[in-house]
Amino acid sequence: MFVTAPEIQWIRDDASLAQQCREWRTQPYLALDTEFMRVDTFYPAAGLVQVGDGRREWLIDPLLVRDWGPFAELLEDPRVVKVLHACSEDLEVFLRLTGSLPVPLFDTQLAAAYLGMAHSMGYSKLVKEVLDIDLPKDETRSDWLQRPLTEMQMRYAADDVQHLAQVYLALDARLSEEKRAWLLEDGAELVANLCRESDPREAYREVKLGWRLRPQQLAVLRELCAWREEQARLRNRPRNHVLRERTLWPLARLLPKNKTDLAAIEDMHPRTVRQDGDFLIELIAEAARLPQSEWPEALPEPLPPEVTPLLKSLRAIGQREAETLGMAPELMLRKKILEALLKSGYPHGPYELPDSLRGWRRERMGQALLNALESA
């Protein structure tokens, strides 16, 4: 059934969604947004999905819709451009609801940066700059799982995709064909990264100071991090609710043998000791007994402070390219990419471009980076 508030159409059942998805798939683009709650959960809880085609706005109630198959097909339809803004969490909502992600993806925050506007520009600021409209902020933190939603919430949600469609048309008209292709390439990479669900057994590589642990201790850290990641997903609780991040390194280094030792670990929550203490003690003991053949390799040390001038010279290559192209410099070369490049051969070389430097960035700046390192 379609229930209409002023200029807003509600979709609250599977048949209506399927019917509307057929119509949406005839459109050249759709503006999409979500409202969700993520207070004490691992996954976002969807409260609303908004769709706009530039003329009308729809609100889909995810608390009532059960069959998301037609919407998943819409998201994957390559003929319809999906327009979102700063959409990493929206993508998580779509993946959780439908099992699919939007392609092709046009992120208006990225588009603004491609046009030389500020990097990581907030939605309200972008709407003000492009459309000269001041958006109300009253509803950004409201409860989107409550029913009924207030008139203010519904208006706010519908206005979001109405203005998003207008912003898209304004920005898209200013993008060169080349920049538009790069922007969609970035959107595709964002989607691909989310599709590659992170391996829980690789999470230990991100722990601060992990490089200071011996391989046997790293085996313990690996098992702790994998358990933490798996339990966060299983329990739908934040990782730090399962086991606080600051406890991981001392647990792997000190190898507590009983609950008293466990409770003495700095920042260890009493709830964790009470609920999971016995299991953690056994997990640590088992991981510490693993044969050497199952230990991870030592993690690489961080780059020394003396690479700072070299990093600056590499970053300058990206800044010069940004000036040439009229783009925000932050779009060019992420710090992680430059650090990976340096780690491939520092201090004496040879250096190798990391796989994370892809597409147009690799084509336009890859050789210049290698040349700069050769002459350093």
From Swiss-Prot:
Species name: Pseudomonas paraeruginosa (strain DSM 24068 / PA7) (Pseudomonas aeruginosa (strain PA7))
Record-listed E.C. numbers: 3.1.13.5
Lineage of origin: Bacteria, Pseudomonadati, Pseudomonadota, Gammaproteobacteria, Pseudomonadales
UniProt cofactor(s): a divalent metal cation
Entries under PANTHER family matching the protein: RIBONUCLEASE D
Recorded family membership: Belongs to the RNase D family.
Function: Exonuclease involved in the 3' processing of various precursor tRNAs. Initiates hydrolysis at the 3'-terminus of an RNA molecule and releases 5'-mononucleotides.
Protein's UniProt name: Ribonuclease D
InterPro entries: 3'-5'_exonuclease_dom, HRDC-like_sf, HRDC_dom, HRDC_dom_sf, RNase_D, RNase_D-like, RNaseH-like_sf, RNaseH_sf
Catalytic activity: Exonucleolytic cleavage that removes extra residues from the 3'-terminus of tRNA to produce 5'-mononucleotides
